[in-house]
From Swiss-Prot:
Catalytic activity: a 1,2-diacyl-sn-glycero-3-phosphocholine + H2O = a 1,2-diacyl-sn-glycero-3-phosphate + choline + H(+)
GO biological process, one term: phosphatidylcholine metabolic process
Entry remark concerning the domains of this protein: C2 domain is a calcium-binding fold, and the binding promotes the protein association with membranes. A lower affinity toward calcium can be anticipated for PLD alpha C2 due to the absence of two potential calcium ligands.
Tagged with keyword Lipid metabolism: yes
Active-site residues, record numbering mapped to chain: 333, 335, 340, 663, 665, 670
Name used for this protein in its record: Phospholipase D alpha 2
Gene from which the chain derives: PLD2
Membrane topology: Peripheral membrane protein
Cell location: Cytoplasm; Membrane
Binding site for a 1,2-diacyl-sn-glycero-3-phosphate: 333, 524, 663
Protein source organism: Brassica oleracea var. capitata (Cabbage)
Pro-peptide region(s): 1-36
Length: 812
């Protein structure tokens, strides 16, 4: 049967199965007997039935009910689903299974042809359940379902941007959008005083950068009642204030000393740090994990700081195998700081306090402090002497010298009602995994800490509307509703037995669908939509990197090409994911990335051909990485030792170059809307039941790109980032949707790549933005950039390698 593109939202309800005669396909053949025997031997087989149903679009799993226990004949779920889709499919498939501790037993499948729903009519019917040979199962059971498909074109926000200040935010989410907020955006941990691009904003102002770690230092220093921190890693030995031109009282204290001091002053200091249980040797030796979790716990032992190492516990709904996967492979990845702070308008003498929060990509740990200059060698005797981070070379150390690994990252400070949502997230997580009930009871402080209220009037031109999004499940946060109906209204996805919040993915999908002119992304990873990958040496349905973001981006570009409207997507990723670039895990991730990009470029080139256009696909979708290269200066730090000869380390030191590690997790749409958080563009971050994540999405209602280009804080922030990456400002950068802009940015990045990769070096690199070193032909195939099979100074393949012995769940 012909496949159709389902691009939009599918509303589905699974009611019940009429009359099951259990046994299903279990007894079929030899394998069924083995499973039964194994179950009986280890005592699993005698239990009750645990029936659940799933929804697939072709071979992509898009929905699943909870389990119904001990209703073997007539399971009733009555569960509704709100499914974002961007899939080619001929059938919508409902599968009924009986769960057991090792896996699940197939009962049968029911098929609804996409032809029946594609026109948008509501379809409600009893559908026959079939076996693997498409024959009715024993007893001719049927499943009762309802479906209605809404194509993206029918969405009133499609291609419209944020139309007005009345835009309500992303629907079906746990946290609704908050008004009257204030947001500060940070490009990295620190911005020195000599980084001063002149970027005009609306109202005659110029953009002013903020300083993340200085602001966090001030927030912690000034807290009087509570300091709550979560991190993938928190390292007690770092200092937050390092700029000798901007000293602060107490700025030489380490983070650990500062937190202990605040706790002795009577402030409740609670830390939730991911308990790195992996010790999966395969990852450890690749340098992927070095979180200091045990050092941090030991440091605070016996102090008044409460530090809890929390593993990424699976929710109770998985099989034994799945639960082992979650606790061994996945992480707590949220990076937040929540404090009480003074109420600015009350003056210094007031006792009144409010809640302030920080959310983003920067962990409070080693290797994160950097500035927009991203020096490789010149800070090794100053701010990076005791914070030398270089996990991409075996045995790298300050005694052997640079290049250090520079760090590109993005963070935000949230004030107003939105800051309380970050607090609620912490309280939910502490209640689930923190152990003792020692959260500050804010109700008892209601005369001091003002309740969630706007920090700005809606009329104020600097005001923000902001919404909080997460990837998390009931294994990591308390307070999720039990009833499927209430969960569905809050946008929570029901799993077999767990409730999942995957609103970060929803927020990205929503923002991409709304986009009118351009999208700018910086992210540490870029892979997904594996249901649409070519079956080149893999079985795509085995990969399960099912999130929609890459496919949504390419379908948006295709739609604009078909309409003859201009639209551009710019993506910045690291050269390779942090770790030894030749290692199996890094090569596997690069392979997934190549497959993702190829899938997108094939969509784009096909659309161009269909319109008779012979254009470079990079004029629509373009990928970059960041790197730096510095000439040697007099008086530079001289290492006592040298790297081993003929190593990547030695070659990079001699060539005086290295990548700038892109750790950002950010998307800007049309210069009016921004998402900043901890979530990568991969399945781990977007799934909800894998890594736990948090993000904010916001806009300034007085600075929308409705009748004229947006010129608020989001625009200023993007221009400041481009100034950092390109080393210049240019008129054409004001309109990233124009052909002139994308051609100019591509041209500059191509030139900088030539400088970066050349044999000789006469000057510092004039900017950091480099083309991602791949070629795209006019059919969308991705091949090596001529002369570049390997990253400079390494033997690591740029296009990656398929690695069969690492399970995809680990690297996607």
């Amino acid at each position: 049967m012909a496949q159709h593109l389902l691009h939009g939202t599918l509303h589905a309800t699974i009611y019940e199965v009429d009359a099951l005669h259990t046994g299903g396909l279990r007894s079929a053949g030899f394998l069924g007997k083995i499973i039964s025997n194994v179950e009986e031997t280890i005592g699993f087989g005698k239990g009750e039935t645990q029936l659940y149903a799933t929804i697939d679009l072709q071979k992509a799993r898009v929905g699943r009910t909870r389990k119904i226990t001990d209703e073997p004949k007539n399971p009733k779920w009555y569960e509704s689903f709100h499914i974002y889709c961007a899939h080619m499919a001929s059938d919508i498939i409902f599968t009924v299974k009986d769960d057991n501790p090792i896996g699940a037993t197939l009962i049968g499948r029911a098929y609804v042809p996409v032809d029946e729903v594609i026109n948008g009519e509501e379809v409600e019917k009893w559908v026959e359940i079939l076996d693997d040979d498409r024959n009715p199962i024993h007893g001719e059971s049927k499943i009762h379902v309802k479906l209605q498909y809404f194509a993206v074109e029918a969405d009133r926000n499609w291609n419209m941007g944020v139309k007005s200040a009345k835009f309500p935010g992303v629907p079906y989410t746990f946290f609704s959008q908050r008004q009257g907020c204030k947001v500060s955006l940070y490009q990295g941990a620190h911005v020195p005083d000599n980084f001063v691009p002149k970027i005009p904003l609306a109202g005659g102002k110029n953009y002013e950068p903020h300083r993340c770690w200085e602001d966090i230092f001030d927030a912690i220093t000034n807290a009087k009642h509570l300091i709550y921190i979560t991190g993938w890693s928190v390292y007690t030995e770092i200092t937050l204030v390092r700029d000798s031109r901007r000293p602060k009282p107490g700025g030489d204290m380490t983070l650990g000393e500062l937190l202990k001091k605040k706790a002795t002053e009577g402030v409740r200091v609670l830390l939730l740090v991911w308990d790195d249980r992996t010790s999966v040797d395969v990852l450890k030796k690749d340098g992927l994990m070095a979180t200091h979790d045990e050092d941090t716990e030991n440091y605070f032992n016996g102090s008044e700081v409460h530090c809890v190492l929390c593993p990424r516990n699976p929710d109770d709904g998985g099989s034994i195998v799945q639960n082992l996967q979650v606790s061994a492979m996945f992480t707590h990845h949220q990076k937040i700081v929540v404090v009480d702070s003074e109420v600015p308008s009350q003056g210094g003498g007031s006792e009144m306090r409010r809640i302030m929060s920080f959310v983003g990509g920067i962990d409070l740990c080693d290797g994160r402090y950097d500035t927009p200059f991203h020096s490789l060698f010149r800070t090794l005797d100053t701010v990076h002497h005791d914070d030398f981070h270089q996990p991409n070379f075996t045995g790298a150390s300050i005694t052997k010298g640079g290049p250090r690994e520079p760090w590109q990252d993005i963070h935000s400070r949230l004030e107003g009602p939105i800051a309380w949502d970050v607090l609620y997230n912490f309280e939910q997580r502490w209640s689930k995994q923190g152990g003792k009930d020692i959260l500050v009871k804010l109700r008892e402080l209601s005369d001091i800490i003002i309740t969630p209220s706007p920090v700005m009037f809606q009329e104020d031109h600097d005001v923000w509307n902001v919404q909080l999004f997460r990837s998390i499940d009931g294994g990591a946060a308390a307070g999720f509703p039990d009833s499927p109906e209430v969960a569905a209204e809050a946008g929570l996805v029901s799993g077999k037995d767990n409730v999942i919040d995957r609103s970060i993915q929803d927020a990205y999908i929503h923002a991409i669908r709304r986009a009118k002119d351009f999208i700018y992304i910086e992210n540490q990873y870029f892979l997904g939509s594996s249901f649409a990958w070519a079956a080149d040496g893999i079985t795509p349905e085995d990969i399960n990197a099912l999130h929609l973001i890459p496919k949504e981006l390419s379908l948006k570009i295709v739609d604009k090409i078909e309409k003859g409207e201009k639209f551009r997507v710019y993506v910045v990723v690291p050269m390779w994911p942090e770790g030894i670039p030749e290692s199996a895990s890094v090569q596997a991730i690069l392979d997934w990335q190549r497959r993702t990009l190829e899938m997108m470029y094939k969509d784009v080139t096909q659309a161009l051909r269909a319109q008779g256009l012979e254009e470079d696909p990079r004029n629509y979708l373009t990928f970059f990485c960041l790197g730096n290269r510095e000439v040697k200066k007099e008086g530079e730090y001289e290492p006592a030792e040298r790297p081993d000869p003929d190593t990547d380390y030695m070659r990079a030191q001699e060539a005086r170059r290295f990548m700038i590690y892109v750790h950002s997790k950010m998307m800007i749409v049309d210069d009016e809307y921004i998402i900043v958080g901890s979530a990568n563009i991969n399945q781990r971050s977007m799934d909800g039941a894998r890594d736990s994540e948090i993000a904010m999405g916001g806009y300034q209602p007085h600075h929308l790109s409705h009748r004229q280009p947006a010129r608020g804080q989001v625009h200023g922030f993007r221009m400041s980032l481009w100034y950092e990456h390109l080393g210049m400002l240019d008129e054409t950068f004001l309109d990233p949707s124009s052909l002139e802009c994308i051609e100019k940015v591509n041209r500059i990045a191509d030139k900088y790549w030539d400088f970066y990769s050349s044999e000789s070096l006469e000057h510092d690199l004039p900017g950091h933005l480099l083309r991602y070193p791949i070629s795209v032909d006019n059919e969308g195939n991705i091949t090596e950039l001529p002369g570049f099979e390997f990253f400079p100074d390494s033997k690591a393949r740029i296009l990656g390698n398929k690695v069969d012995y690492l399970p995809p769940i680990l690297t996607t």
